[in-house]
């Protein structure tokens, strides 16, 4: 008699594989996510590098607008300082600026967002499609959120940077919480001035700050 109640064995490496797939999907922004996913895992099974389409190729193949910091600034201005945005409203904003629906869905899936979305978290993951590395992602987020409108270096409150760095590192899964804590403590104690702001150069040009 065949057994039907055998326990399902989940490989320990599966969560990491799925996380890497989700991040790769955000960066590739494929038109057909299902086919792209099939090609991705087929390449992995053969021990090959998974497919990643170049941005120029993506633009040439579709009529969608290109995701840029400027487009994200438009979305941020429409959010108008709110911490929470409803998924339906954000999807409509995304559609109005003509960004790919698959990219929106990928960000939603990676962030495990539901009906009510924390805007800063969504923005951080959208920026990761452009930034590739954590440092570059945070640089783009700072440019989008910058409170300096006089042509100076992009800068944001350190508390906001702390929240974003902690969240992005958590989603990435490759950086220990202790490393994140050490970097934040160093920046807060040795870099941040009395205004409580952090500039892009504070974490991109300082040799003692290594966010990855």
Swiss-Prot record:
The keyword NAD does not apply. Keywords: Cell projection, Cilium, Flagellum, Phosphoprotein, Ubl conjugation. The modification Phosphoserine is found at residue 56. This is Ropporin-1. InterPro entries: ROP_DD. It comes from the Eukaryota. Important for male fertility. With ROPN1L, involved in fibrous sheath integrity and sperm motility, plays a role in PKA-dependent signaling processes required for spermatozoa capacitation. The keyword Lyase does not apply. The RIIa domain mediates interaction with AKAP3. Sumoylated, sumoylation decreases upon spermatozoa capacitation conditions. GO terms for biological process: cilium organization; flagellated sperm motility; protein localization to cilium; regulation of protein phosphorylation; sperm capacitation. It comes from Macaca fascicularis (Crab-eating macaque). 'Ropporin' comes from the Japanese word 'oppo' which means 'tail'. Belongs to the ropporin family. Homodimer. Interacts with AKAP3. May interact with SPA17. Interacts with RHPN1. Interacts with FSCB; the interaction increases upon spermatozoa capacitation conditions. Interacts with CFAP61. GO terms for molecular function: protein heterodimerization activity. Residues 209-212 are annotated as: Interaction with RHPN1.
